[in-house]
Amino acid sequence: LANELAQIAENCGIDVWEAIELANKHPRVKILQPGPGVGGHCIPIDPLFLTENSTKTGIIHLARDINESMPNHVIHSIRDILYGLKDPTLTVIGVSYKGDVEDTRETPALKFIQLAKNEGYQVKCHDPCAKGFVYELLEMDEAMEDSDCVVLMTNHNVFRNINPSLLKMRNKNLIDTKNFLDHEKWRDSGFNVKILGDGHYTGHSLQK
């Protein structure tokens, strides 16, 4: 539900994070937070056990379809931001399935990276927590160098310590899929910031 609301919010020009915060003030409402998809060894798989012996499970399948579509939704945002840029490079920060864990099983970051590569983007990855990921994990400086867009996929607390003014990127763009970073700090460092689910975004890519 939260991820579908995020997509609706972007189309309607509203901030889904504000809308969810207001809705959750009602004592009988508890909408979760949107994001780039759902991973791990439980949530993406276990609900499907309920569908094995029943045909009346439309909501379960629909929920999975929406969550599975979120990496593609992030790709659409990147297309708009980096349109026309030659040989674009993305830096993915966070590849484990959730913040402050090393587990990368069923992580939506993997699907996102594969989609990005299929679209012709160069992709570099950085994650100080993850282990056993299929793509090489670089140190922060190397992952950021000459990149055109940072894509935060996992909300590791250590990422709050990034100093965006020190990043040696070719173009300064940030997509925050978790509404996690200090966006004013990034904007003050010259970054064009897009937050998943924030329909107020009207920025354009900063391209050299």
Predicted regions and their residues:
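Structural/interface elements that position substrates and couple domains in central-metabolism enzymes
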Residues: 1-208
